[in-house]
Amino acid sequence: MGAAICNRRIPESRLKTATPDLEKLKMQYYSLRKKYMKAFDDLLDAERLPSVNLSKPYNTKILVEALHFWEGKKLVNHAYSIMPNHIHWVFELLEKDEDGKPVYLQDVLQSVKRHTASQINKAEVITGALWQKESFDTTIRDDKHLYYAIRYTLNNPVSAGLVKDWKDWPGTFGCDGCGDL
């Protein structure tokens, strides 16, 4: 692990001696982040009557189309679950789009949020913000982390008590090979 600041790299040996508790602090950070995310997810799952139900069939259709719109152009979908008041979405950004331009996470999220907000607001005959400004994104670092992220995403409707098997939830998608999770 190294740190980059203003295009200057701090040598690993110096980083370790200057901050001997770095690994401990890193583990505390990840532990607190995990607890925060769990508490946030629990709050979302407990809200049974959201002002806009994303899992209504028409809203789910809008979201499914949007989540697949950039497939093969800017991203590869691995899994998603459309819950009544939030979405879990695991995807891999491509380095470049079909025109050879770099692909940025914020551009994909903004595009999906803008389009789905417009369409769902129209369907629900409402105005205003549909999505929170903040999204909780996580960088997946290896295959094990990817496996657990997909499993967590697919099983979210089960954990929320909405179905007994994730395959029974209409707003859930799992990539090929996800059937046994």
Which residue ranges define each predicted feature?
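Short catalytic/metal-binding and nucleic-acid-binding patches
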Residues: 1-181
